[in-house]
Amino acid sequence: KESAAAKFERQHMDPSTSSASSSDYCNQMMQSRKMTQDRCKPVNTFVHESLADVQAVCFQKNVACKNGQSNCYQSNSAMHITDCRESGNSNYPNCVYKATQAEKHIIVACEGNPYVPVHFDGSV
């Protein structure tokens, strides 16, 4: 079974792309990263930074998670991200997404040993 840390990497990490160059980016990535298999995942964020930089966030600013848990962390610096949002004409299995690029501080939930990101909580 896929670990929570591996799932985070599959769903949110894309260090090899500096930013989403085309509107097709989300459609291709959401499909290739298997987030459109049994439904269209409505919203997903990809982070265009190194895995080491994202893992380091687990040791940065401790903040409350949206669900009230205390194991979330906000990055000290802004990171290149792409938000993929399902667009109005999307209809499973033909999932259609709109890409929005931003440079924002990310918030991730971390757990385990080693202490690594397991959930993307948001960006500010």
UniProtKB/Swiss-Prot annotation:
It is found in: Secreted. One of its GO terms (cellular component) is extracellular region. InterPro entries: RNaseA, RNaseA-like_dom_sf, RNaseA_AS, RNaseA_domain. Gene3D superfamilies: Ribonuclease A-like domain. Pancreas. GO terms for molecular function: lyase activity; nucleic acid binding; ribonuclease A activity. The active site is at H12, H119. PANTHER family: RIBONUCLEASE (PTHR11437), RIBONUCLEASE PANCREATIC (PTHR11437:SF24). Monomer. Interacts with and forms tight 1:1 complexes with RNH1. Dimerization of two such complexes may occur. Interaction with RNH1 inhibits this protein. This is Ribonuclease pancreatic. The gene is RNASE1.
